[in-house]
């Protein structure tokens, strides 16, 4: 009787294992957006913890400190904690904070492998809301970051590094209703349009019917976050109905 050669099977199994992150030293950082708080991201944090992930619901002074400074603080913290692998879940401006962190990483230094990055409604190409308030009398009261999120091609948001990891993008839409936000010509969540959220290197993009500020609290959004973190994919349907 001819014996089966298991060497090819063992080889491919070894390659598969080597390409998986070391989840014993994998940490997921969760970041709120401009004016947000730990409470806003608490359900996502608890959902990931329930699935066995080591997480940190990371907060920062979004009204007082500029994005570059916050990104540097995050970089220093992650480097000091020295996990093998890190992932991110961000809402709104939190995505820009993580993108700014990339500026401080160089190939010669030891820095954890960045595995997955799930963005909820990120103003990757700015937001018309920032355009409006950047030119208003309220600008001085809103802190340094509003003007950094303008939509013009020379703005700060446009110049940030593009993530090199697996990116999953969740964008909020409400339909093209002029009464929803008169400042925005395209489909939007009240703050960020789909067009301004997209970077172009996403592994997957999915839309949900949600207002901007409520997105991290939605059960279906949390389900999508958990699914992408575990599998690297959302679901087949491109729109999740409430």
Task: Label the predicted regions.
Residues 20-24:
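Sec/Tat signal peptide C-region and signal peptidase I cleavage site
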Residues 26-34, 55-61, 65-164:
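Serine-dependent carboxylesterase/thioesterase catalytic core
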Residues 161-242:
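C-terminal catalytic-base region of ester-bond hydrolases, centering on the histidine
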Residues 1-9:
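Bacterial N-terminal signal peptides that target proteins for export
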Residues 42, 69-70, 127-133, 178-183, ...:
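Short aromatic-enriched loop/helix-cap "lid" or pocket-rim segments at secondary-structure transitions
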Residues 37-43:
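The serine-hydrolase catalytic nucleophile loop
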């Amino acid at each position: 009787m001819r014996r089966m050669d298991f060497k090819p099977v063992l080889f491919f199994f070894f390659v598969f294992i080597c390409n998986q992150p070391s989840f014993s030293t994998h940490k997921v950082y969760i970041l709120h957006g401009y004016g947000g708080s730990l409470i806003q991201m608490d359900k996502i944090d608890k959902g990931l913890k329930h699935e066995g992930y080591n997480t940190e619901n990371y907060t920062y002074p979004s009204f007082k400190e500029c994005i570059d400074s916050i990104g540097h603080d995050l970089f220093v913290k992650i480097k000091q904690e020295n996990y093998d692998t890190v992932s991110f879940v961000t809402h709104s401006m939190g995505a820009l904070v993580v993108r700014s962190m990339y500026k401080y990483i160089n190939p010669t230094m030891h820095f954890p492998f960045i595995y997955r990055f799930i963005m909820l409604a990120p103003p990757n190409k700015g937001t018309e809301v920032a355009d409006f308030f950047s030119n208003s009398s309220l600008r001085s009261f809103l802190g340094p970051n509003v003007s950094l999120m303008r939509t013009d091609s020379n703005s700060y948001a446009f110049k940030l590094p593009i993530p090199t990891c697996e990116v999953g993008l969740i964008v909020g839409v409400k339909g093209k209703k002029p009464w929803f936000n008169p400042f925005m010509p395209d489909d939007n969540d009240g703050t960020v349009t789909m067009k301004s959220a997209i970077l172009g290197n996403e592994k997957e993009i999915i839309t949900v019917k949600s207002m901007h500020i409520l997105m991290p609290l939605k059960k279906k959004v949390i389900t999508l976050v958990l699914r992408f973190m575990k599998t690297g994919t959302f679901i087949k349907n491109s729109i999740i109905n409430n």
